[in-house]
């Protein structure tokens, strides 16, 4: 968010806060209390209506129709009182709080008051504004390049804000005071965690099973263990509030059912914080899957002059491994699609140096395969010095620029590698579009998780800001809940 947008956000929050304060101060000195009465009561004279003897409030108007008693209440001075109604088959009592400036709230210190619907509506406007800014930034970044970790973090935040927006709309439709909104939020978080936990467990099982296949094929390494580690990292915060509950309730023998207890609100804070963080991280993980899958399945525009084939390990006899063969075949397939679409030919750039245990360079091995597939040598430009993806892009781009400084470039790699390779190209200001070759599913899952962790690292400053904001909001919400329960 830029400086200008932060200023606009501050002005919006200040303006809405001021409007909310004015609306509540103008309307909050009176309150319309509606009480459902037994149908056997025919008229208001059959009821006994009483208030506290301290003259904190007074009833200025009474009306009874269709089984509902309507009372108009006005504040006299600060304090706490009640409205007691009794009749044949009916008894009710409502606590009334009168605050500074004569503002009346019902039942709880932060209960419903006249005009307070403006508060959740203001929050809805702020969330909508933040969401619109993030969508605008996301679209702008996507237009520049699809391959950026900032796109993942932005989409994750868009998903998170969207869920908040839906939750806020539901709150407004059911609004019954600020305190009840807090209860609804805490209940929503609880329901969300219970609904998501089976999904988290299922994902953990699927990731673990797929990683056993990967470990069997590739061996045990930290990179190959990422999925299992991440599974535990998501499960632990999901069950953490339950562990805290057991600690307070079973070991310390402290009741968490008393809403006035400080321990109850510590538990609420930990639950709200844990589940909010987990839901935010899940939104980032979902956005990682969406963008990585979109990148891998996307077909580049048919305007390409060159297509780089990213190298990887070759066989001992100098022929291509199945993975590298798939990359070359995908490049050939794209060249055919482009030729059929507009007649434009493409130059292949097989890229990859010679490893210590390889008899020829990966670039030369790919070239040999292309020749076998009927590609003419004048359509092949070999890059044979690179040792990694960064150098694949860098050295290939340098060769291309020597021939034509204004070329449209594509690259072919394994589908799970498209997004990461695209990011490496973007960091070098090389404008490219990737196309993905198929591979085993267990490579996909590990790649998604690797990109998720890379996003957390690359966008750590933004994520820490969201982390701090969630912490502050959680503390404010639980503090207000505690104040309201006193």
Where are the predicted features?
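Extended hydrophobic blocks
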Residues: 2-32, 97-301, 402-408, 412-486
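A short, amphipathic beta-strand motif
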Residues: 33-39
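Short, solvent-exposed loop/linker segments at beta-strand-coil boundaries, enriched for Pro/Gly
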Residues: 39-65
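Glycine-centered tight-turn and secondary-structure capping sites
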Residues: 65, 75-83
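Short strand-edge motifs at loop-to-beta-strand transitions and within beta-strands
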Residues: 67-71
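Extracytoplasmic loops/domains of multi-pass membrane proteins
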Residues: 72-74, 414
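Short, exposed coil/turn segments at beta-strand boundaries within extracellular/luminal domains
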Residues: 88-93
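A structural signal for short, hydrophobic/glycine-enriched beta-strand patches
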Residues: 289-290, 296-447
